């Protein structure tokens, strides 16, 4: 994986903790702080440092100036305090200073932050953004021309994610037909003789080689030109890559690729990119053909919906509780909602894998009145609270 600096992946997972107290504090305070933090963060590796801390522990009043000397613009910080000794008062003063200086911070009593899970969520949010730093993504072809709200400038990827976006024209690649078919995909279907499976496995080989050669952690593929010109889809190839943890978005959707990268780090698995096929009452209908195999059961091969050509994936979503997420094209706004799977339709006029999700009325109202785009991301599990914090960390407004 490409890196922008000398930090290793292990170093990026370490939370930086600082402490502050009045000038008369004894030399034993440092070791007391470390013992205290080990109780608060028994499962999170951390290091004590005054340089760009992720968490500052207040041990007493009179510690404000030292605290603000350690806080840097653009680097969010969690302010926690011990009980008593005017520590919370000092933390409150510093919290006000961060607000006045447009620095994102959160304030809590240390014990309460541990009991409520705030420290755990904060550490997760820090690691999400640190983990994305230095990664590399690729756009194969162009953003599909119908995705008028989903283009993301390369500069924005670099600014927000510290991710480099490489644009790769289709005509710069080898012809997919010259590739050996990918054995993992053929074996998944027991070397089924379905028309188009071998061709789909060749597309997978091409994309896998591209990702490996260019050191890509994620790709967005303009796939419709492939099926229109060569009558072969990338659906199964993208599904297999997503299943392996390699983010692969279809239709050249850069906004969705960004969200998939974020959710993959935050949740541990690549979410499903799906069309907003409709809403009815408090139900949302999603459909698409590139779902990771591990997210579905009863997998069948079908033709691609829009063209009735080649192959697409038809499966049954196995999750019950899910989180729905979407970035805006500028990556400055996000939609987040938790829902419950209520049905698995089989409509003939929609993409092959389909699911019905019950969402809060307020969330559905936002999808109708202020959608950020057609494509939505669905991740199994409940992650709304974490994702709200992850977005706040980078001043991304949740609608």
Whereabouts are the PLM-identified features?
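Short, glycine-/Ser/Thr-/acidic-enriched flexible segments
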Residues: 22-24, 62-63, 142-145, 224-226, ...
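Structural motif
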Residues: 18, 55-59, 218-220
